[in-house]
Amino acid sequence: MSSSTDNNKGFEVVIDEGETFNDACLPQLLRLPKQTWPILNAELCERFSYYGIKTVLVIYLTKSLMMSDSDGKAYYHAFSMVSYFTGVLGAMMADSFLGKYKTIIWSLVLYSISEIVLTLTTIPSIGKGNSAGPLIGLFATAVACGNIKPCMAAFGGDQFNQKDTGLISTFFSLFYMSVNVGAMLTMIFVPMIRTDIKCYGSDCYPVVFGVNCIVIILATVSLFLGSPFYVKKEPEGSIMIRVFKIIGHALSRKMKSSEETYHHWLYYAQDKYDKTEIDDVKSLMKVLVMYLPLPVFWALFHQQGSSWTLQATQMDGDFGGGVMLRSDQIQFFNPVLVLILIPAFNIVIYPMFERCRLGLSPLKKMVGGMLLAAVAFAITGFMQIKIQDVQSPPPAPPATMTSVDFINVSPCEVIELNPSSFLKISLPYGQNTGHKIGQSGNRTFKVKGTNCFKKVDFYTNEVTVSLKAGARQTVLLDIADDGMMESTVVDHLFPAVSVTKAHTRVRTFYVPSGNMSDLVHLTYDHVIEKKDSVVVKNFTSYNGTYDFILADEYQLLVRPWNSQNGYNIKLPSENLKLGTFGAYTITLKRPKHQKYSRDLVAHLYEDVDSTSVHRLWQLPQYVVITAGEVMFSVTGLEFAYSQAPPSMKSVLQACWLLTTAFGDLLVVILSVAKPVDGVEKEMFLYGGIMLVVAFIFAVMSYFYTYSDFSGNITTNPADEKEIEESKLNSADSTTHL
């Protein structure tokens, strides 16, 4: 998130000596035209709805529509790209044909319809899991949002008289606050709705999109109810269209004329257009050349909602005590950090450079922002390497040896192997030895079970196990109802994990008592992420293969295959926490000292350590990218507005939107092309591209000559209002993306 508002003089509230803040501000609020309040409410609701979709979008695409991560990223950035491209079209349509009010209200109607389509098609019984319906709804939403983006602030400004500069400043402050409040609220609460409400056995996207749909309908109704009171100005023509006409006419005459020569090709248009207009377009194009490298920054910055969110899905957000930082909720750090870093740069960092006689020009600040973005992606790449540092399974034994893990799955308080031997193994109830290397072949052990069915009893007999050479195996030690000690040998095979998915591996041994069914349905029920439960049907007692499931906290449900009534299960803790890329063994067995029981006790063994990287470790990359945003975006807006004539401000705003759109387009292209394999390599690639572009931009900046338009700026309140509107629109376009 970024904004130029912190440096806008029009946003300052001056409090006379002796006045309290409320004394100074409350009258201003009460004096605002009544028709501005529906506009502010509509803006807050529209921003909430837009970011409510965008915050969860990449997770919805990859986890619900089951797209690959690269395809999910491509569609995410295509959604963003369309909203910024159509922002330019919306501005031209409002200025040339419909006017601002009609453009906004009809776009809100389209917005509402498209979100209804999106909500309905996420319902499994309607959408059938097909991506066509949701994608149509998303595309229409992006078009509607784009049309509104450049119009709402300007329409609000139209409600004031030219002399009400103080009220205009108050309105724009409230407008910017509405944008921020809408975005921040949705980044906090929508992920909670996604995970905490369960419908159709999974994350409740119909409710997520349904809430956003209701909010955008409220925005539409709010704006419509104020219609009788609005000042609705007629379209006056688009300056952007006029710029295109001047450029087109100049190029046409230059190609046709062989006699006339001018020191700049734009002056070929002076037969039809005023020289002042041509000079303004010439100044504009000088700035637009400096815009050419800017899309690369936005290509990196916008991946907070795609690549960084996907990275967060592979990390651990548990703070303990039931407090969870969700993978899409972490995006909230960006707006919070903006509020901290903008004053930090203005009050501390920039003055410190000045005191050291290292003054930073606007272009130098922008280069610094680009370099920080590159550093942020380098951090992201190294973080991905850490996340993907999958731990190895226990070492394989030598060719003539075996590696064995003994587990006590009996109700005995203690099981001892070779109890009279110096090398005896003692296993308390539910405990295991971990993998031990020993001799392979047929091995006979004397096994003693103590306090098995009573608190004072013991059973002893020999068991023979066949241990494979060069293999890892698990030996489960149990006791039969007649008191005979038993053993079951299961191969312990570790399937490789995919580092692109936040999976874990789990195998479960079900060891029932004599009055329980040997064939059951086993369910791993998600606790944190409300995904579809993982159901293993017709599960048998010693099925030792690993299942791949999403890393999460789980409850276990076991019921006989021919019954709806499950067994009571006592877990070792409140839930079973299975970490990313780990490997786990779960045993379900009789309670201690019980021969017959309808209850089961679960024990969890970590066969391979999980890669447990907390989501808070993403905070450094968020701090760096946000610092880069403050240096790049805020300064970029100030640079652009200082280097172009006042008549070209709206064109600069439109072109700023286009740099954002082209940044998204770059991500779409690279996501589809897949020039490198591996997320970490992709992050380093983006960081490398940013470094190269920062160097090119630094060279361009070195040869750039600053212009001074201070003599051309009028103090006409209408002009000041137009500049404030343009700055706010551009700030909105780059702040909450």
Predicted regions and their residues:
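Hydrophobic transmembrane alpha-helices of multi-pass solute transporters/permeases
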Residues: 2-454, 461-462, 468-737
